[in-house]
Swiss-Prot record:
This is CBY1-interacting BAR domain-containing protein homolog. InterPro entries: AH/BAR_dom_sf (IPR027267), BAR_CBAR1/2 (IPR035590), CBAR/FAM92 (IPR009602). It holds the Pfam family FAM92. Belongs to the CIBAR family. Residues 352-368 have a biased composition (Low complexity). Residues 240-375 are annotated as: Disordered. Component of the DZIP1-Fam92-Cby complex which promotes ciliogenesis in sensory neurons and spermatocytes by acting downstream of Cep290 to initiate early ciliary membrane formation and thus transition zone (TZ) assembly. During spermatogenesis, also regulates distal elongation of the basal-body and their docking (anchoring) to the plasma membrane and as a consequence, regulates the initiation and proper elongation of axonemal microtubules. Component of a ciliary transition zone (TZ)-localized complex composed of DZIP1, Fam92 and Cby. Interacts directly with Cby. One of its GO terms (biological process) is cilium assembly. In neurons of the second and third antennal segments, expressed at the tip of the dendrites. It is found in: Cytoplasm, Cytoskeleton, Cilium basal body.
Amino acid sequence: MFRRGKLSFLNTKDDRVKIINERINITERHLMEMCSSFALVTRKMAKYRDSFDELAKSVKSYADDEEINESLCQGLKSFTNAVTIMGDYMDINVHRLEHKIVNELAQFEQLCKSTRDNLRLAVIARDKEVLRQRQMLELKSKFSANNSAADSELFKAKMEVQRTNKEIDDIIGNFEQRKLRDLKQIISDFILIAMKQHTKALEILSASYYDIGTIDERDDFIEFQKLMKTKEELASRKTALKKGLRSQSMDSLEHEHLVSPLKRRPKLSRSNRNLTGAGINHGSKTEPEDETDEQDEEEDDEDEETEQSGEEDEESGTATDDEREPTQPGNQVPPRENVFGAKIRSASKDIATPSTSASATSAPSKPSRQTVKHPFKAVASTHVRLQKQFHVPQH
């Protein structure tokens, strides 16, 4: 730009400007990287604070649901309070980092930009004064007779160059001083913030550690064993009660099964009662209750025979009163008719041969049982007989 032989002082000034420009660029690049790193730390701490809130919530939920271990419940509640307070301090630290660290570092971008612009303007002003000083020197060398005006202009140019150089020095010095002061303050603030956080956390964690140490494992385990014993006793009582009820029901069922079916007294339904009231006998047991096993077997055989005969009568459906009525002696009362027009059957088997009657008188008499048909089968056969008697057409 200028010849180094005549204006040698300009070389040193230009070197200083070059150095300060490099310093500004380095400072801006590294401080912006530090700002982004501190911002990342702040965001991570905010997530860490949210994680502490979730941890406190889960521990509190377990402490509320715990009902047996009392000391454990108290220790968990103390730990929940400690975690909650630590989360609150983390929230305060997040706000402090945002205001005192990240925002302060972000201002260095504007500082570097303004310093670079001021330095450029100062260098331009200095170059103008240097050019003017060069012109005055050339004019003085050409017109050596009248040098008073040239000397005064040259002096003014020199003063302007000195002023611009001083301004450049002030810009460079102010930038360096502010950079050093602000960086020192920012790093100190970060350290103090971390120390306060860890100091409070140490106090809280110390108290929580003492509370956790007061958990009595033995007493809690004894309470658990007592609860289990009471639960087992209640369960055993319930099972014993169920077994007792079941045994009673089974005994009653077994008693019902042990009783002979012949000794059971069947309950008459409404139809059976009507038939009995109409004159149709369902059957009567004339045997005493202390019958032997042989009599029971004979009665079972007779019941089977009567059932078979009743089935045959129902299938044929052509029996009449003359066929069914046995030959009765003359001294017997004539049979009555029921509401259906049927005659009552004889209650005992009177039809017998003389030999059988003689043997019956000689042999010990056994209680005879009436051969009774099923009431519903008797009704069916009577109905068929009445249809034939009154010539009712069948459908």
